[in-house]
Amino acid sequence: MTLSILWFILIAVLWIGYLTLEGFDFGVGMILKILGRDERERRATLATIGPHWDGNEVWLLTAGGATFAAFPEWYSTLFSGAYIVLFIILLCLIVRVCAIEWRPKVNSQTWRDRWDWVHTVSAWLPSILWGVAFANLVQGMHIEVVQTSNGAVVPAAQVPADSLVPGAAHQITGGLLTMVTPFTLLGGAVTCLLFLNHGALFVALKTTGDLSQRALRMSRRLAPAATAVTAAWALWAQLAYSGSALSWIPLVIAAAGLIGSLLMGRSGNEGRAFALHFVGIAFAVVFIFAAMAPNVMRSSVDPAYSLTIQQAASADTTLLIMSVAAAVFVPGVLAYTIWSYKVFASRINVESINPDEGGLHPTLVRDSTQPEAHFGY
């Protein structure tokens, strides 16, 4: 295994961490106004992600930073050509921080309601756009190799398969509308439904009483649609765009996870339902990266214009230094993440919440008098 392939896999792992963890953060925000009937329930719903949402965003920062360092050509091509979509996602993430942090600053229900709506919108948009973005990476984008000096397109026959053209760069030359196709829109529906169900299961797992039961019932209604739409999109991707038979393996595992989650949810076991849904999303991300390989960005204009893992990678010296750093720090990050979820494993008792008291205090999200949220037992 070359260092470039190793880092392609490591970046996939970082995206797994982000989408599985931030996925339920988005889902909680999406259902906040639907599930929370009053201020007490909305505060309890928000408290489920209170200790974790900002830490979960670190996975995105790390994935972006790793891409910049390990695959600079991939980073520059993607960010320069899809900057509008990525800017909207970034803006939503910033606004969501304001919605969560500023919500309790004023003891006014009108103030809180407005920020709840902001939170909801800033959760829905990225949930859809992430799916559209990853579907574009699988389907292929309007990419050509262009001379940086005069903007002339390099003929496809002159583009080497294992190196970059001197004085030229891969560029997304199509407009924003070329990224909007039935396949990419279905990809947006996939992430939207998966995150909705992920959030509902997390609230069911982390709360008690009527709120937990209503969240579980919501998941039971969402799970069939999420599973069916994901299966349709994944089969479309595999049959039309994947160049590897190996990508069937994560596809089947993802399907098994989502179906198992659906069955566990129907049996009333929200812990196992959430754990299996987590597995389903994780292997859906594995499937996306397996379908992309050996490219990091596929060209819909001509296969010769596709940006491969080898072409996009940094020098081996850079990748070696990054590998040593990752071997030192990544286990610590994983250990801390697991520990933080263990510390705040207690379920949240809705009845113990004072609706007039703002903020997500530690006593609210870490109540030793409540049972812990376990995954299946």
Regions found by a protein language model. Name each.
Residues W7-Y18, F79-L93, T120, T178-L194, ...:
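Alpha-helical transmembrane segments
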